[in-house]
Swiss-Prot record:
Organism: Thermococcus kodakarensis (strain ATCC BAA-918 / JCM 12380 / KOD1) (Pyrococcus kodakaraensis (strain KOD1))
Protein name from the UniProt record: Diphthine synthase
Lineage of origin: Archaea, Methanobacteriati, Methanobacteriota, Thermococci, Thermococcales
Listed SUPFAM superfamilies: Tetrapyrrole methylase (SSF53790)
Residues holding S-adenosyl-L-methionine: 10, 87, 90, 115-116, 166, 209, 234
Top-level taxon in the UniProt lineage: Archaea
Function: S-adenosyl-L-methionine-dependent methyltransferase that catalyzes the trimethylation of the amino group of the modified target histidine residue in translation elongation factor 2 (EF-2), to form an intermediate called diphthine. The three successive methylation reactions represent the second step of diphthamide biosynthesis.
EC number(s) reported in the record: 2.1.1.98
GO molecular function list: diphthine synthase activity
Family: Belongs to the diphthine synthase family.
A GO biological process held by the record: methylation
Length: 264
């Protein structure tokens, strides 16, 4: 039979596309994972009510280590839906799952949905000017990742914007805020000292993208690091070289200081 990778969109249960909803309703079994992203405006129960079916929620271990044991056997003789926040193929994990399905002889289809990669356009920053993205992860006892700093540096050298995803530890109910991400990046700056991310760096914060009232703020790190952006999920953007229209948009819609108009 068929395994459908279905995106749920960005914020609540109403973000799923009509095609995705109709397909999920037709499926014999429905699985979902929420450890790669957060749908802040809904609950599993609301999604179940909309689809009209019970949903089996999978953990990171279920998906990454036991997909062949839990999901693929069901898809051998049933139509199965695998629901994910955002667009299903944005997460590398899901691309790997589709490869595994093909190797197991299971046919699969992808049904897209709104993604942060498109919603970030609400910042007014031009999509084609974004460079490589990166994730700011929580440091651990013997591990302090710094690759995101290098990505920002490389993008800045090319005049490109950097979209930073913020760490999610769903099993611990920990969702990194933009404030925490800025603090981590300042610590990396102290370690590396390359002037890539300082209190004078211009940043853009987007919170709850996809909701009717997202928070959009732009300013210097020293101004925003203690600001309350409301509930997660948050993303942090470090702009590269700004076009005048981008700068004007940030001033008008994100409260950026007018000083940035003089710097373009």
């Amino acid at each position: 039979m068929v395994l459908y990778f279905i995106g749920l969109g960005l914020y609540d249960e109403k973000d799923i596309t009509l095609k995705g909803l109709e397909t999920a309703r037709r499926c014999d079994k429905v699985f979902a994972e929420f450890y790669t992203s957060l749908l802040a405006g809904t609950t599993l129960e609301k999604i179940e009510e909309l689809i009209g079916k019970p949903i089996v929620r999978l953990s990171r271990e279920d998906v990454e280590l036991n997909f062949e044991r839990i999901v693929l056997p069901e898809a051998k003789d049933k139509d199965v839906a695998f629901l994910t926040a955002g667009d299903p193929m944005v997460a590398t994990t899901h691309s790997d799952l589709r490869i595994r399905a093909k190797k197991a002889g299971v046919k699969s289809y992808v049904i897209h949905a709104p993604s942060i990669y498109s919603a970030v356009a609400i910042t007014g920053l031009q999509i084609y000017k974004f460079g490589k993205s990166a994730t700011v992860a929580y440091p651990e006892k013997n591990w302090f990742p710094t690759s995101h700093y290098d990505v920002i540096r490389d993008n800045k050298e090319r005049g490109l914007h950097t979209l930073l995803f913020l760490d999610i530890k769903a099993d611990q109910n920990r969702y990194m805020t933009a404030n925490e991400a800025m603090e981590i990046l300042l610590k990396v700056e102290e370690m590396k000292g390359e002037g890539v991310f300082t209190p004078e760096t211009l940043v853009v914060v987007l919170a709850r993208a996809g909701s009717l009232e997202p928070t959009l703020r732009a300013g210097y790190v020293r101004e925003l690091i203690n600001e309350d952006f409301g509930r997660q999920p948050h993303v942090l953007i470090v702009p590269g070289r700004l076009h005048i229209v981008e700068a004007e948009y940030l001033v008008e819609f994100a409260g950026a200081p007018e000083k940035i108009l003089e710097e373009v």
